[in-house]
């Protein structure tokens, strides 16, 4: 065998080996890319659920705060109208009783929302 034939055979061998490794690399890269895409999709799904949950919790806090503000304003108006007809002590006691009940409900609902937040 002459030197040119040996070089040609060796070159063909290297190309064959190279093509084998490029196929293996391509397959491994495709597998890794698939895993990466799956992970990214899972991340997007989890992120979407988390964002949706946070939005719902924000809505609940907002609604709860509006309700509490409304009840507090209602109690203040009730206190003013009460003062026109009754003694200050009687109005004061009645108003504080309403405000205390409102505050207990508010705290109870806040705890319930916080419990839901912890679940996520």
Set out the residue ranges of the language-model regions.
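Mitochondrial intermembrane space
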Residues: 1-120
């Amino acid at each position: 065998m002459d030197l040119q034939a040996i070089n040609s055979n060796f070159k063909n061998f290297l190309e064959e080996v190279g093509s084998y490794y490029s196929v293996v690399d391509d397959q491994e890269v495709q597998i890794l890319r698939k895993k990466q895409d799956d992970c990214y999709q899972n991340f997007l799904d989890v992120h979407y659920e988390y964002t949706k949950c946070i939005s719902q919790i924000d809505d609940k806090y907002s609604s709860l705060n509006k309700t509490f503000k409304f009840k507090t304003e209602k109690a203040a108006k009730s206190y003013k109208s009460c003062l026109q007809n009754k003694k200050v002590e009687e109005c004061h006691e009645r108003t504080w009783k309403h405000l205390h009940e409102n505050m207990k409900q508010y705290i109870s609902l806040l705890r319930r929302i916080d419990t839901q937040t912890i679940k996520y």
